Structure formats: structure tokens, C-alpha cells
Amino acid sequence: MYVPEEIIETIKMIEYQNLDIRTTTLGVNLKDCADKDLDLLKENIYNKITSFGGNLVETANKVSQKYGIPIVNKRISVTPIGLIMGSTLKGLSNEEAIDACVEVGITLDNIAKEVGVDFIGGYSALVQKRATPEEKMLIRSIPKLMTKTDRVCASVNVATTKAGINMYAVKKMGEIVKETAEITKDAIGCAKIVVFCNAPEDNPFMAGAFHGPGEGDAVINAGVSGPGVVRAVVEQLKGKDIGTVSDEIKKTAFKITRMGELVGKEVASELGIDFGIVDLSLAPTPAIGDSIANILEAVGLERCGTHGTTAALAMLNDAVKKGGAMASSNVGGLSGAFIPVSEDAGMIEAVEVGALRLEKLEAMTCVCSVGLDMIAVPGKTPASTLSAIMADEMAIGMINKKTTAVRIIPVPGKDVGDSVEYGGLLGTAPIMPVSEFSSEEFIERGGRIPAPIQSLTN
């Protein structure tokens, strides 16, 4: 039985505190699409995705109207393309193989536009130990792909707690990001490339979503968003101890997650597809008041990035997980608090006033959901430095048995003090300083950082 106060509270959350379903993401298995013939492969991919996803947008809009809850994005994730290209690329030269991979990416882009989804993820490779020949070609094709597509997202898993860190892949991804920055406008292509450690197979959020090899034929995963709601709750707790703040955040996360699961299950039911998970992540937007940084400041920090930020974020992340886990038995994905600089108005302000630096962000990633996300750095930053930043973040994920990721943007022609405007959910990225000391010799070593002792769990 709902009481009037609860109904009014929900309306307030949606109307005044930016509560929404950030995404309903359809995951589609493409393993059965593999074929030696490139044209047949593309045809199989088209038929498979459109058969499941042709009505995704229409259905999500219908459910959104039914419950009065905004569903901001409708997305698709697919089986990592690196897993299905082997027979197609056999016997091709390197250039021919790269072009073939790009053609598949263009097919995905065309499908995304036809069915009306915002992004399609899964142009991916899982290379935490070693890369197969087709995965090497797929990785090499990423910069070219980004010049020819608008909605395709690429991700590469270069490390896991069980496998260690593939430093060859880390080195290559620094070069790939650098090349992509140089050939796409304002380095926008880099906003669609993620480097992962311990990548989840059921992540609904872009740019790192892919449909994992252990998933079924099709699934709907939902991602919620509620920083504005949490901030409003925290602002009502002036003078209360941290335990009380944590408890109230937990209760709020419970309500947000319930809503996410309700909508996700309804969309899945309407489409006749299994419901997978609800991702508990608090995902900010550039809108004022819809900020993770502002939550931390409401807890009592003058600015996000000052001493105490990591502790406050740890408390927030843990409270969100506890509340969400109580609300749903189907929790997955990344599930925590996102800290993407360009997509969070409070983070942008913190960088601009000098309160938040790359080193502090790295510390924050030890206790939050993902990693260094939407970080813009000077265009002159060498590829080896980009790789070294990735290696640091992969090490945090590997040792702590958690997902970490890097989405970094070296913007050509920009330096510290400048910013780059992407608009929409990607927001505005202030250029952040990186160390001027070289990591090149370390990165050039290649090889593999062995799996840590905590990987021996059997």
C-alpha cells in the first residue's frame, strides 16, 4: 500500500531532482553470426540485431509514458566483435583485415541509426593475456572506425585479477588513443574508447558496454541515475553524523533501484526478452544539481578533490551498493558512483579552481565504480604517458579485484587552462595537467605484469 507522501516524493524526484532511467540496453549475442564471407557476416549481424532490437526505442518510450519515468537513452551492446572475426579475416593482408573490421563497425553504426538507439557497444577485444591475430587487427582498426562512424563504442579489456596486465596491449592502446585524437574532431573519437581491467559482461553503460560470452541470446539491462536525488537527501542532514548520512543514502538508493528494476523488467517483458540486471551506478550529467561532486560537497567538503574526498566517496559508493542490493536480486554491471569529469558540472568546477587533479582522481578510483573517465589532457601528451596512466589504473583494478577503466582524451592544440566542448551528455572537458616526466622506457618493455597473489583463490 502506497501512502500519499511516497507518491509525492517520487514525483519530486523525477520533476525536480533529475531522477531518470539513464539507459535500457539490449544485449545481443552475435556468436552465431560468424562467417568466412564478410558480406554474409554483415548480413547475419544486421538480421540478428534488428530482429531483437527493431522495437526497442518504441517499447522503451511506451514504458516511459506508462510510468511517467524518463528513459534517457536506449542502447545496444553486442558480443565482442573480436570474438567473431577469426574466420572472416583468415588469409587477408593486414590492411584488408583492418578494412574488413571497419566495415563491420560501419554495419553496427547503420543498425544503430536505423533502430534509433543512441550508441551501440561491443566493438571490443578481450586481450588480458594475449591477443589473437583478429583481435590485433580489430584494435588497429579503432582509429579508422572512429572517423567513419558516429554511434559505435569500442572497448578493450587489457587486464584482469586472474590474468594480470597485458602490457603489450596497454602500450598499443596508448598509441590507438593518441592516433584517434589526431584524426577525429576535437579528439571526440577518444570519448568512445574505453580501456578496461576486469570488464563486466553485463554493463549497460557506454562506452564500455558489450554482451559477454557468458550471456544468453538477448537480454535487457537497465542503468539508473540519481545523483540529484541523493544530493537533496544529504542536504537535509546538516549536522548529522556520517553513519546517519550513509543510512539515508542507502534508503534512497533502495527506492531508485526499485524503479530501475520495474522499468527494466517491463521493457524486457514487452519485448519478450529476458531481464538481466539493474546497474546501481549513480551516473551524473552536466546538468546543474545532477552531480556526484556536489553530493560529496553536501557531505561537508568545500570542494570535491580536497582532503577527505576519497573517504566521502567510499561512504557514498558503499551506501548505494547496500541499498541497491537490498532492492534487487539482479544487480550487476558496474554498480557504484561514476566520476566522469566532463559529464559532471561539480567535477568541472573543481578542476577549474584547482581542487581536483588527476592524481586525486586516481585515488578516488580505488573506492568508486569505474576509473579515470572523460579526462581531457594536453594534446602534446605522448602515447607512452597515456599508456602509463592506463597501466596505473589497470593495476588498481587488478590488485583490488574490481573493475577499473580509462577513457582519456588528448586534445590536439589544447593545453592546461583550455577546455573542449562536446555538448549533450559528454559535456565540457577542462584540460588537466599530466606529469612531464617520461614513462617511455617502462612502457617499451612490454610483456605481462603477472597476476597478483590474490588471484589464487581456489
Swiss-Prot record:
It comes from the Archaea. Gene3D superfamilies: 3.20.70.20. InterPro entries: UPF0210. Belongs to the UPF0210 family. HAMAP family: UPF0210 (MF_01221). This is UPF0210 protein MmarC7_0672.
